[in-house]
Amino acid sequence: MSEILDLEAKPRTEFGTGAARALRREGRVPAIIYGAGKTPVSISLEEKAITKYYRKPAFISQLINVTIDQKQYKVLPKAVELHPVTDMVRHVDFVFLEAKTQKMEVPIVYEGKERALGVKRGGYFNIVKRRVTLLCDVNNIPRNVTIDVTNMPIATSLKSSKIELPKGCSFVTKKEFVLATIIGRRGAKTEAEAPEVGK
């Protein structure tokens, strides 16, 4: 289980643009928790606290304990609205954690991409997917998926079938897809032309 952050929240009973503006004047932002077949819960959060958490790496896959009137809810961020100028958080959607497995987006970390064999030979590391959708055991939710691409040659593609996922996780889709490629000097090859890593 990855680190769990804590957030204090207050119940929200007034809605609409005017109510949201009033909250923001108090240094708070509106938020909602829904999903897992549960009744949605409308809350407000301290703006500085949630913005600080948002700026942490891999926020979208961060487990959070939200406490409302001494009741605690384990949630995951779903969507975040930011102020267009200040980048402070203006609204957050959370989802309740499911009972056994959780469908979620997880960031991909391509470890060693600057040192990859194909890059050293003049190729360009092209990221096709920055996140993947996984089905994860709720007791083993990863912050990210780390892939070592140091030995990836030039003119190759990295496919989902070659990736070892964290324990308790699987891809939502069974269809194979490309995560990254190393493009040769003369431009990218098609997936059919580009050999898979390890071949």
Swiss-Prot record:
InterPro entries membership: Rbsml_bL25/Gln-tRNA_synth_N, Ribosomal_bL25/Gln-tRNA_synth, Ribosomal_bL25_b-dom, Ribosomal_bL25_C, Ribosomal_bL25_long, Ribosomal_bL25_short, Ribosomal_L25_dom, Ribosomal_uL5_bac-type
Keyword vocabulary terms for this entry: Ribonucleoprotein, Ribosomal protein, RNA-binding, rRNA-binding
Keyword Ion transport tagged: no
Any matching Pfam family: Ribosomal_TL5_C
CDD domains assigned to the protein according to its UniProt record, in alphabetical order: Ribosomal_L25_TL5_CTC
One GO MF term attached to the UniProt entry: structural constituent of ribosome
GO biological process, one term: translation
Gene Ontology CC: one annotated term: cytosolic large ribosomal subunit
Function summary: This is one of the proteins that binds to the 5S RNA in the ribosome where it forms part of the central protuberance.
Family that this chain belongs to: Belongs to the bacterial ribosomal protein bL25 family. CTC subfamily.
Summary of subunit composition and partner proteins: Part of the 50S ribosomal subunit; part of the 5S rRNA/L5/L18/L25 subcomplex. Contacts the 5S rRNA. Binds to the 5S rRNA independently of L5 and L18.
Entry-linked HAMAP family: Ribosomal_bL25, Ribosomal_bL25_CTC
Protein name: Large ribosomal subunit protein bL25
Organism per entry: Rickettsia akari (strain Hartford)
Gene responsible for this protein: rplY
